[in-house]
Structure formats: C-alpha cells, structure tokens
C-alpha cells in the first residue's frame, strides 16, 4: 500500500443495491449517506447511463451511486473515474461494514476489503486498493451463514437510529475531508461515539 493521499476527494461513491426491494436494507448504508450528502450539497441527482449510476455534482466534486448491483460497483466507479481523470487516491467509497457495531464509523486508506463484494469489484476495476473508504457499521449477525440474509434485511428500529446518527457524524467529517485534513477526520471518525442507544438497551 502506498502512503495515504492527503488530497481532497474528487469522487464520493455510496455503495448499495438499486431498486425498491433494497432501499431499506443494511447493505444500502452507502446510498443512505449519499442521499443525505446530496441534501447537504443541494445537489440534483440524475441517472447517467454512461457511468452506470446516479450522479451528482457539487463544484469540482462528484457523487456516484452505482446502479449495477453491489458486486459490479466497479463498473460504474471505473467508468466515471476514467472519464473525469480521477485518480484512485482521490476517491472516497462509503459502504456498510459488518465488523463494526451500528452507530460507529471507520475511515481508512487502502487495505483489505473484508469480504465486501462492492470493494472487491472496485479494486479490480481501479487496479489498486489505494483509495479511501468510510465504513458505516451495521453489526454482524454472529453466524457467517446468516450474513447474506442479514445485509439484505432492514435494520431493527434501534439499529436504524444508531446508523442514522453515524451518518450524521460522517457528514460532519466533510469539512475536514474537503480541506484534505484526513488525519483529523480519521481520528474523529474512528473515535467511539458517546453512549450509542443500542448499547443502552438491556
């Protein structure tokens, strides 16, 4: 892995699956983040077939929600990145993370993909693992055989509240990230939030 890029991102990608059947499922946490980011940016989102996804723009920054289904996300990311000459290190991918409890975040550059099929395909299309990832915790079902069923179901109410709170915290990182202050953003993202609601429930 190369040293982390400190350049602000030119492309923010939210991962998920298209269609109403998947809108409220855990695997769509990246889409949820981008929906809130589009509101914050005041950006209009439109489907662009050449990029295989829904695209928004804010100044010189792009947002992409691939509409290819999760395991082909790289097709969309690669197409937009090549067209606009965006380097992998200038890309931030926002996705759900099984190994983190609901309500928590992790920001990191490069590294492994943790079995996430969306990241695997993006890495294959970019030819490198060296891009930024913002991981939104959705928790783990406890049994590997239950993972597919788990990520394709909606969170419980208390989990949804924690995930929504984490997304708001993630939006709060953007002023740092947009200035290239990745170290400060990483420290803030990776710090444990105070008293997540789901942990207070007996």
From Swiss-Prot:
One of its GO terms (biological process) is rescue of stalled ribosome. It comes from the Bacteria. The keyword RNA-binding applies. The keyword Cytoplasm applies. The active site is at 27 (proton acceptor). GO terms for molecular function: peptidyl-tRNA hydrolase activity; tRNA binding. It catalyses: an N-acyl-L-alpha-aminoacyl-tRNA + H2O = an N-acyl-L-amino acid + a tRNA + H(+). TRNA binds at residues 22, 69, 71, 117. Monomer. Hydrolyzes ribosome-free peptidyl-tRNAs (with 1 or more amino acids incorporated), which drop off the ribosome during protein synthesis, or as a result of ribosome stalling. Catalyzes the release of premature peptidyl moieties from peptidyl-tRNA molecules trapped in stalled 50S ribosomal subunits, and thus maintains levels of free tRNAs and 50S ribosomes. This is Peptidyl-tRNA hydrolase. It comes from Thiobacillus denitrificans (strain ATCC 25259 / T1). The gene is pth.
